[in-house]
């Protein structure tokens, strides 16, 4: 018997194994039947079947399966199979979801029957599995049934295999499965229940099937159909036509096939190039494609209909999708060919053969189907009751919620629904009342569509049927029983009315958004808002709005700082309307529906258009309390939350605009202009300054470090706003008109606009400030004078309210900059101001000429079709040069006595300025306002030039601006002179579109555009479907497009390059270049006349260009939405871009380049409100300085300006001699002004710049534009750079001097005021980040690459105290730009041009590279001396010297200690404190140290004065002190330090300490590594710096708060750091630092002294992936030499010992070149372990990092100096390297898996966004169609039937509100898509950088290093862009939260109650 038993057991095991291994449905059933017969089991005994089967099959394989199934069945919810013992369930459909539901019900003990109409599982389609799904299937023994299940990194499975697994489990658990049985319908219980009680049954096919008598209590529909079970209404989600093709190819499992990588998906959102390449090569046009490898090679793709028609796949085109895809209309052969071609291309032709697998019909397994519409059931369950029998009806799977296939949601959400349904059945069996049961089920169903792998619980082990274990924050009662009464279907209930709908809780958002609004309400609201405004009487929605005053009144009502209502002329309807349209679009994202010209020309504006337009204001502002001006100002001054400061009104109404638009109103402007304020509040101007002071950039006292954080955020937002405004206002003729009009009026609109004191007295320019002493105290006499001028200017420009207001704000802030410190200097300023007035007068003359030229150039843009002469003539006729307000302004404001500050930004003294390529204009209103943080609204150019001498405040900046504007205009020859500098400039463009039809004519198809379907961009109106790329015809979105203003064409991002390279553009460029050369000649002749003005103007122009918003580049508010693509936004590229003169006509409408770069640059300029204007001045200075070396010569007010001196310099000099502080303030003001008003480069220049970059991809960023010596050379730096105004001191632009001699530049401090002599080299971009001195080692450019403001970087490098200024003779133009040095040579002040730079740039002086040797040596020595000697040396030196590393210094460099050299400490304790503060900021590597020179030029006290300043506690002062701080470490150095910190534990421990180290490292290293690798992101965001000490301001000489600058400037570090950076990569030692620089991605390198926490926080802010540092650790192992170089952070090596120490460290690695016999130094004590996780690192990933750390530590331990190594280094190295290799492989594998998972997450998000965008588009199209129908009826063009006009209008209004919501939603999706695209790009760049760093340093050549630098720089830029997006989203979130709170309080105040759902 025993043998028989054993045999039976063996046989049973074999039969069971056959069942488990069955590979088909039929085979499985057959094996199961054999098994049950063999074991004598009854399958119908569902309660005992599993337990009997388990007892009879006891093989070890079976036991493993039983263990898993028992573990699942042990959940308490099942109650050991007794929860639902009396329940009978019928499941229709045997798919994965139906079977999974059956398994759960079987565990509950229910009787489960599954009917499946097929008898085969033939679907090879592959499903993506979520992590929880994989875990769940493993728990059911999936591995036992299918050994390959999710092996390795596989996370997908074919439907067939999944069905087999679940099928077998269900059979084992006693589920009754019937195949070849089709469900027909449910049969109700018969009415005759007396004889026998028959319950619910079903009808099947075949009709005689035994199941026909089966009665059940629960029926579940799981067949994927939409109408199998009655009673479920469906919601349709219609997207664009989506045709999916699935193809399965035979998988022969060959080695070649195994090597082919799968494609988890390619999303069009962030990989458009792939699809465009596919289309070009094969003609196949797809939207996405996925490739999975399983039993087959499975491809699924979404094809575009036109592509299918072109390839002959679809024979005829039909509108009806069913007809389109019917078998008769599909060519099967072409379909097979289409699928094969796509598969080949997607796999890069690596699959050896693509033979189609066969389906169950014996045909090639290729299918085409439509999923244009996806459906979801409105409800998940219902209860039917008949004859006292209740039936629970439920849906699961696709029947419940149809999935979007690329997302992989079908299986995951299907399983979740199965669990929820089983939970419901359990409750049903326990007697829960039907309504409660249904309410709970619906509550869960509402969560289902929102579930993602990220928002469900991560602890899969705890998953049970209970929804609380799966859904976090579950509210299972959000749906109330009364809300589901309609789901309880019974005769008795049908007659009962449902409860009032009002009782249903609605979310606050819904309640508010859906409030019932009628046109009458709209009219009443408008009347209320415009009540009390002069000349405004709203009686209707048409004629009352014709003058434009009513629109302006509404905007002024809620945002008084945006419009100067008092300056508006009632008769000028065109400009009033255009102003309102432009401000609304720029600030609120409300697109115009017509133009100002049309509004004024029509007798009665179109009612429908007005209803639609005004409704957007209503939705935006309704319920918004007016914010008291004073409180607003106070909040702003206190750095109150930006979003709150906005007063709950988002900058972009519909989120339509991207970050640039969202920027908070950071300007210091008050809610109202001074006049209004006085009128409403009764405050005198004297009081106003105090209000502004808190906001003013320069107010050190009020803007304490506590405000810094707020300021930084403001800076970002302001930068964004500036960009948007700058671009938008680029072509606003209306502004010019407005200015003209205002000037004509001549009444002093705002007497006090310039300065508070001035306001009261309106003193003459010469007069000192009037008596108001308190305010006077802040104001310099010059300020008063300029104030007067400003007032006059303002009068002229009163029309441009925006301008006037900014002026005021700026003036105030400037005055404050002067602060009390300036009070003493008041008397001295007057003479200077007067002297300035003379300069200004000369400037004016020059400007007039420039303006004339500029008008001609503008004509080119506007009328590109004509030749230049014709264009000029046309412009002259249109705008009349004589009319320019310039003359008026000049005469009025710029008298000799007065330095009338052209600052009055409005009319900018020179009309040209205002007209200046809307550069100024664009910058003007909008920008200015945004800039207004500083309060400046001048044209950027004006401000820059003016501010130095005029007054610290408005005047000085005004003058600088005027000069700069002139230069910009001249150089950029942008638009016609827009007279109004106000934001209207853009409006002007739109008002008078030269080549446009009316707003009701489509720009593309020339057909009529009805109001509801009208879209607008760049002043054009068009249909949605007409808005396509000119090349590929891809439909464009308002948030993502590029525009060539010359040709009037729109492009998609990938094809924008086309407009840069086509021949027409080249020709145009050539013409422009010639023109510019002629202009340059003219300018040279004029230069002597202009003197400084010329120079400053040039600088200004450069700045403008840097700003990057090419004047031509019209920036629609929407364009700001789109973030420039990384490739376009290369700040470096921009920097390298040709001078403005070179910039060619192409303009990227979305501001691809300009946008990204501009935003950065602008951000820098605007950066700190609290920061003194210095910050901005730094920018300006950098521009000037970088262009050429300058010596600063003290300038005496009496002395004439040197011909080459920049106006800014002259001004600063005039001021500086007497009072360093005053000059400082003045300089700051100037800089700020400059920064704000950088003229934008002409589009031509932009084009040229981009083209130039494209020619030299690697070096383009570092290269200067090809020999473009235009005098006004805007810094090549990216537009963003341009934003920074040239500091007065650095303003001198070498390029400015026509002769090529660079105008002298003044250093920031008067004593230093040195003008470096140099030849004007085209200003190379300050960002030389990438540029490396030819002789110098290539280092990772400072963080600057990120920021468009490289200019600062230049300065930064030069810390006057640390790096001596090189002798003027020595300095080349590059040298002049110390900031650049940090970029190129982080350590050196001199910028070494890339080799390319040197070539391309025209150097009047010797090339940097040649200088590198000598100068560097001198410099290094000098630097050292300076380091030790402190500021004194700096004073002595007039020029910057380049530092050359001596061998000793090189070794010093290797001392990676962050600590400052003792000499430095001893030299200046103050410096140390400053430094620490700076480091506290996070010591951004990228931070260029502020141009030390510039700060001084600003009037910053000399280093000697530093001590006194430092004593002052204000951050600004500290910042000044910072200048003196030792030069920042080069990024390389910083990186090396960071790396050292992270790796030192590995390197430094001795053998004995290895174990301890391994433990510690596992904890410490990850955090450190994180810090090292990625603090980049945060620094970019400008947030981290603020968080730290006030020292963060250090980067800027004057304004500590300037966040933007901060980001760019390098932390000031001991100069010793620079030596290595400066030294050429001759030795390995030098290479290491260089390598390190490249390796480290961290922007901020905290000092070693800083606690690790700060580093960690920086890292977290970056949100970079753990993988990056882990991989970095691995890479670091390969570089043993580097590793050894890192010393303990605390250990200091004296310079003399550093070489020896280095050699010792390198010994173990046998670096033959460095190896020495010296014994290795003892290991330093291990640093305290940092917190367990770095801010950004996920705790869950920490273990991996720990492993990495351990591995690396052990690996490094061999290499690290240890006793073992000393005795037998070779042996230990070999052994450990083997271990390391194994671990590395393991880690690499894990890393790849993590990378893939992250990629998948992004992919699914992208695909979901893509689908949602398509759905929104379809809904918009549907609403547009309906809107057109209504519009025709309202206009009498169609029969309206029985509806009267009131009904139609009401319907129209509802439609308008619906469309507004859709637009809002679309804008949010687009922002999400953009962020996702940047995230993906960042991830790829990180991976690329890691791969490059894996290469041994010794094997890298110059090309490798350059590529590494480029990748690093690009990565920085991407991070910067992501930060901006995230900030804008956060702003929006806070704003909406504030709105909700306000709404709730409003509701509660009326005794109502709201509940959220």
Curated annotation (Swiss-Prot):
Q: Which cofactors, if any, are listed as required? A: FAD
Record field: compositional bias (Polar residues)? 687-714, 1232-1243, 1302-1316, 1570-1579
- Record's catalysed reaction(s): L-methionyl-[F-actin] + NADPH + O2 + H(+) = L-methionyl-(R)-S-oxide-[F-actin] + NADP(+) + H2O
InterPro entries documented for this protein: bMERB_dom, CH_dom, CH_dom_sf, F-actin_Monoox_Mical, FAD-bd, FAD/NAD-bd_sf, ProQ/FinO, Znf_LIM
Which classification does the entry list for the species? Eukaryota, Metazoa, Chordata, Craniata, Vertebrata
Specify the species: Homo sapiens
Residue numbers spanned by region Interaction with MAPK1: 1324-1363
Extract the GO molecular function terms from the UniProt entry: actin binding; F-actin monooxygenase activity; FAD binding; metal ion binding; mitogen-activated protein kinase binding; monooxygenase activity; NAD(P)H oxidase H2O2-forming activity; oxidoreductase activity
Query: Which key words tag this protein in UniProt?
Result: Actin-binding, Coiled coil, Cytoplasm, FAD, Flavoprotein, LIM domain, Metal-binding, Monooxygenase, NADP, Nucleus, Oxidoreductase, Phosphoprotein, Zinc
Q: What is this protein called?
A: [F-actin]-monooxygenase MICAL2
Q: In terms of domain of life, where is this protein from?
A: Eukaryota
């Amino acid at each position: 018997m025993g043998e028989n038993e054993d045999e039976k057991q063996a046989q049973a095991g074999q039969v069971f194994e056959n069942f488990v291994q069955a590979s088909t449905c039929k085979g499985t059933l057959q094996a199961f039947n054999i098994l049950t017969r063999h074991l004598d089991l009854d399958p119908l005994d569902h309660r005992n079947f599993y337990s009997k089967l388990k007892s009879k099959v006891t093989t070890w394989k079976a036991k493993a399966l039983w263990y898993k199934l028992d573990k699942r069945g042990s959940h308490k919810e099942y109650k050991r199979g007794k929860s639902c013992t009396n329940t009978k369930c019928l499941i229709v459909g045997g798919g994965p979801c139906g079977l999974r539901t059956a398994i759960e019900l079987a565990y509950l003990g229910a009787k489960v029957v599954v009917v499946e109409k097929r008898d085969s599982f033939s679907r090879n389609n592959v499903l993506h599995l979520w992590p929880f799904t994989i875990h769940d299937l493993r728990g059911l023994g999936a591995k036992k049934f299918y050994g390959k299940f999710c092996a390795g990194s596989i996370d997908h499975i074919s439907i067939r295999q999944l069905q087999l697994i679940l099928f077998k489990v269900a059979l084992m658990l006693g589920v009754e499965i019937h195949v070849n049985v089709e469900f027909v319908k449910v049969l109700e219980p018969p009415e005759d229940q007396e004889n026998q009680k028959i319950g619910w049954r079903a009808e099947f096919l075949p009709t005689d099937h035994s199941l026909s008598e089966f009665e059940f209590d629960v029926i579940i529909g799981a067949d994927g159909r939409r109408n199998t079970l009655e009673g479920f209404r469906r919601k349709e989600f219609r997207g664009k036509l989506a045709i999916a093709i699935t193809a399965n190819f035979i998988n022969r499992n060959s080695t070649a096939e195994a090597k082919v990588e799968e494609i988890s998906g390619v999303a069009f959102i962030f990989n458009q190039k792939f699809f465009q390449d596919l289309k070009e090569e094969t003609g196949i046009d797809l939207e996405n494609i996925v490739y999975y490898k399983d039993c087959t090679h499975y491809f699924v793709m979404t094809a575009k209909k036109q592509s299918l028609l072109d390839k002959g796949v679809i024979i005829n085109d039909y509108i009806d999708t069913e007809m389109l895809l019917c078998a008769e209309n599909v060519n099967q052969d072409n379909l097979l060919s289409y699928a094969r071609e796509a598969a080949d291309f997607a796999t890069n032709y690596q699959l050896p053969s693509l033979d189609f697998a066969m389906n169950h019909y014996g045909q090639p397994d290729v299918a085409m189907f439509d999923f244009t519409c996806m459906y979801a059931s409105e409800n998940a369950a219902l209860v039917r009751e008949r004859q006292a029998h209740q039936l629970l009806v439920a849906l699961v799977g696709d029947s419940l919620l149809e999935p979007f296939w690329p997302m992989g949601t079908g299986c995951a959400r299907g399983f979740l629904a199965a669990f929820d349904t089983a939970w419901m059945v359990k409750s049903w069996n326990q007697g829960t009342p039907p309504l409660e049961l249904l309410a709970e089920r619906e509550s869960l169903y509402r969560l289902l569509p929102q579930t993602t792998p990220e928002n469900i619980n991560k602890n899969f082990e705890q998953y049970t049927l209970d929804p609380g274990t799966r859904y976090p924050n579950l509210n299972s009662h959000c749906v109330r029983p009364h809300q589901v009464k309609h789901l309880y279907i019974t005769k008795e209930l049908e007659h009962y009315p449902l409860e009032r709908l009002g009782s249903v809780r609605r979310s606050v958002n819904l309640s508010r958004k859906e409030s019932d609004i009628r046109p009458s309400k709209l009219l009443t609201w408008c009347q209320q808002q415009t009540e009390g405004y002069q000349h405004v009487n709203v009686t209707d929605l048409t004629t009352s709005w014709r003058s434009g005053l009513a629109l302006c009144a509404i905007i002024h009502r809620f945002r008084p700082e945006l419009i100067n209502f008092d300056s508006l002329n009632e008769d000028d309807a065109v400009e009033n309307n255009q102003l309102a349209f432009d401000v609304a679009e720029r600030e609120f994202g409300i697109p115009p529906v017509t133009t100002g010209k049309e509004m004024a020309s029509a007798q009665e504006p179109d009612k429908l258009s007005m209803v639609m337009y005004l409704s957007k204001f209503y939705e935006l502002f309704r319920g918004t309390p007016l914010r008291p001006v004073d409180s607003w100002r106070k909040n702003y001054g206190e750095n109150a939350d930006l979003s709150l400061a906005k007063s709950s009104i988002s900058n972009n109404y519909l989120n339509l605009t991207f970050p640039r638009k969202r920027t908070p109103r950071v300007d210091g402007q008050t809610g109202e202009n001074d006049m209004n304020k006085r009128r409403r509040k009764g405050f005198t101007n004297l009081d106003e300054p105090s209000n502004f002071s808190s906001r003013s950039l320069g107010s050190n006292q009020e803007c304490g470090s506590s405000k810094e954080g707020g300021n930084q955020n403001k800076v970002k937002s302001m930068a964004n706003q500036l960009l948007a405004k700058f671009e938008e206002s680029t072509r606003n003729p209306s502004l010019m008109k407005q200015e003209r009009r205002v000037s004509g009026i001549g009444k002093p609109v705002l007497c006090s606009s310039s300065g508070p004191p001035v306001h009261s007295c309106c003193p003459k320019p010469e007069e000192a400030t009037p008596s108001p002493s308190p305010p006077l105290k802040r104001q310099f006499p010059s300020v008063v004078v300029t104030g007067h001028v400003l007032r006059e200017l303002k009068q002229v420009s009163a029309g441009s309210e925006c301008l006037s207001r900014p002026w005021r704000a700026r003036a105030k802030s400037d005055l404050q900059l002067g602060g009390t410190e300036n009070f003493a200097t008041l008397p001295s300023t007057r003479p200077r101001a007067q002297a300035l007035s003379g300069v200004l007068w000369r400037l004016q003359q020059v400007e007039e000429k420039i303006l004339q030229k500029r008008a001609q150039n503008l004509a080119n843009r506007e009328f590109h079709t004509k030749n230049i002469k014709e264009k000029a003539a046309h412009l002259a006729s249109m705008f009349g040069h004589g009319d320019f307000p310039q003359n008026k302004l000049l005469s009025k404001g710029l008298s000799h006595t007065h330095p009338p500050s052209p600052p009055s930004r409005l009319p900018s003294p020179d009309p040209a300025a205002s007209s200046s390529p809307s550069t100024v204009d664009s910058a003007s209103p909008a920008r200015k306002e945004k800039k207004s943080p500083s309060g400046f609204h001048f044209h950027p150019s004006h401000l820059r030039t003016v501010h130095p001498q005029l007054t610290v405040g408005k005047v000085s900046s005004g003058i600088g601006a005027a000069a700069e504007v002139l230069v910009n205009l001249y150089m950029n020859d942008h638009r016609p002179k827009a007279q109004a500098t106000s934001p209207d400039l853009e409006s002007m463009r739109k008002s008078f579109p030269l080549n446009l039809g009316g707003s009701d004519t489509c720009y593309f198809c020339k057909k009529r555009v009805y109001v509801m379907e009208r879209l607008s961009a760049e002043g054009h109106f068009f249909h949605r479907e007409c808005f396509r790329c000119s090349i590929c015809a891809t439909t464009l979105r308002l948030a993502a497009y590029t525009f060539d203003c010359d040709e009037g064409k729109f492009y998609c991002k990938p094809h924008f390059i086309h407009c840069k390279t086509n021949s027409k553009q080249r020709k145009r460029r050539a013409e422009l270049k010639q023109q510019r050369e002629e202009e340059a000649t003219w300018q040279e002749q004029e230069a002597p006349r202009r003197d400084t003005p010329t120079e400053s103007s040039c600088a200004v122009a450069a700045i403008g260009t840097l700003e990057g918003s090419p004047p031509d580049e019209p920036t629609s508010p929407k364009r700001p939405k789109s973030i420039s693509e990384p490739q376009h936004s290369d700040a470096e590229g921009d920097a390298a871009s040709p001078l403005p003169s070179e910039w060619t006509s192409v303009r990227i409408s979305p501001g691809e380049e300009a946008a990204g770069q501009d935003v950065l640059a602008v951000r820098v300029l605007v950066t700190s409100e609290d920061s003194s204007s210095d910050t901005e001045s730094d920018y300006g200075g950098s521009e000037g300085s970088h262009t050429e070396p300058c010596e600063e010569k003290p300038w005496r007010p009496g002395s004439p300006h040197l011909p080459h001196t920049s106006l800014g310099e002259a001004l600063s000099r005039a001021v500086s001699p007497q009072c360093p502080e005053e000059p400082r303030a003045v300089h700051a003001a100037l800089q700020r002004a400059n920064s704000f008003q950088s003229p934008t480069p002409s589009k031509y220049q932009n084009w040229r710049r981009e083209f130039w970059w494209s020619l030299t991809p690697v070096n383009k960023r570092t290269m200067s534009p090809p020999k473009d010596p235009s005098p006004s050379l805007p810094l090549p730096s990216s537009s963003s750079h341009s934003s920074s105004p040239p500091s007065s001191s650095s303003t001198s632009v070498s390029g400015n001097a026509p002769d090529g001699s660079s105008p002298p530049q003044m250093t920031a401090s008067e004593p230093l005021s040195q003008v470096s002599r140099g030849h004007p080299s085209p200003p190379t971009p300050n960002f030389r980040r990438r540029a490396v001195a030819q002789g110098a080692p290539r280092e990772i450019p400072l963080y600057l690459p990120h920021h468009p403001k490289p200019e600062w970087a230049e300065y930064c490098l030069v810390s006057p105290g640390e790096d001596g200024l090189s002798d003027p003779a020595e300095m080349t133009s590059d040298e002049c730009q110390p900031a650049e040095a940090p970029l190129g040579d982080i350590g050196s002040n001199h910028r070494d041009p890339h080799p390319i730079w040197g070539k391309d740039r025209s150097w009047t002086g010797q090339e940097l590279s040649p200088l590198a040797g000598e100068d560097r040596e001198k410099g290094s020595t000098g630097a050292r001396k300076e380091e030790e000697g402190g500021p004194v040396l700096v004073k002595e030196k007039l020029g910057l010297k380049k530092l050359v590393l001596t061998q000793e210094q090189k070794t010093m460099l290797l001392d990676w200690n962050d600590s400052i050299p003792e000499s430095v400490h001893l030299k200046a304790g103050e410096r140390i404190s400053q430094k620490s503060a700076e480091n506290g900021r996070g010591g951004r590597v990228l931070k260029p140290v502020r141009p030390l020179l510039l700060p001084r030029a600003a009037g910053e006290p000399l280093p000697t004065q530093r001590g006194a300043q430092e004593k002052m506690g204000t951050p600004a002062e500290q910042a000044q002190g910072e200048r003196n701080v030792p030069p920042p470490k080069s990024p390389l150095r910083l990186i090396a330090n960071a790396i050292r910190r992270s790796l030192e534990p590995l390197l430094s421990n001795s053998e004995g300490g290895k174990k301890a180290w391994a433990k510690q490292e596992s904890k410490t290293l990850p955090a450190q590594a994180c810090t090292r690798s990625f603090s980049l992101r945060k620094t970019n965001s400008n947030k981290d710096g603020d968080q730290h000490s006030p020292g963060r301001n250090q980067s800027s000489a004057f304004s500590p708060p300037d966040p933007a600058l901060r980001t760019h400037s390098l932390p000031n570090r001991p100069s010793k750091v620079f030596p290595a950076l400066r030294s050429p990569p001759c030795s390995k030692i030098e290479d290491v630092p260089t390598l390190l620089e490249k390796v480290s991605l961290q922007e901020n390198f905290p000092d070693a002294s800083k606690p690790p926490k700060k580093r960690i926080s920086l890292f977290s802010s970056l949100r970079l992936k753990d993988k990056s540092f882990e991989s970095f650790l691995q890479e670091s192992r390969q570089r043993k030499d580097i590793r050894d170089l890192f010393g303990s952070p605390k250990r200091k090596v004296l310079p003399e010992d550093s070489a020896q120490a280095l050699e010792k460290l390198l010994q173990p690695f046998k670096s033959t070149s460095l190896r020495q016999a010296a014994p290795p130094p003892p290991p330093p004590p291990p640093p305290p372990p940092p917190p367990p996780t770095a801010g950004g690192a996920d705790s869950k990933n920490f273990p991996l990092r720990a492993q990495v750390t351990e591995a690396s530590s052990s690996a490094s331990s061999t290499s690290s100096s240890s006793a073992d190594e000393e005795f037998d280094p070779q042996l230990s190295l070999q052994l450990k390297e083997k271990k390391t290799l194994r671990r590395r492989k393991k880690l690499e594998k894990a890393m790849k898996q993590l990378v893939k998972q992250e990629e998948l997450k992004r992919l699914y998000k992208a695909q979901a966004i893509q689908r949602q965008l398509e759905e929104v588009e379809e809904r918009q199209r549907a609403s547009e169609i309906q809107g057109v129908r209504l519009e025709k009826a309202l206009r009498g063009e169609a029969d309206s039937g029985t509806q009267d006009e009131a009904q139609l209008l009401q319907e129209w209004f509802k439609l308008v509100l619906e469309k507004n919501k859709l637009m809002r939603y679309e804008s949010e999706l687009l922002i999400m898509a953009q962020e996702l695209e940047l995230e993906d790009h960042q991830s790829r760049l990180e991976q690329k950088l890691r791969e490059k760093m894996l290469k041994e340093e010794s094997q890298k050549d110059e090309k490798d290093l350059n590529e590494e630098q480029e990748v690093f720089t690009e990565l920085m830029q991407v991070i910067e862009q992501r930060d901006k997006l995230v900030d804008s989203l956060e702003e929006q979130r806070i704003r909406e939260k504030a709105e909700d709170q306000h709404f709730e309080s409003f509701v509660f105040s009326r005794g109502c109650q709201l509940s959220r759902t």
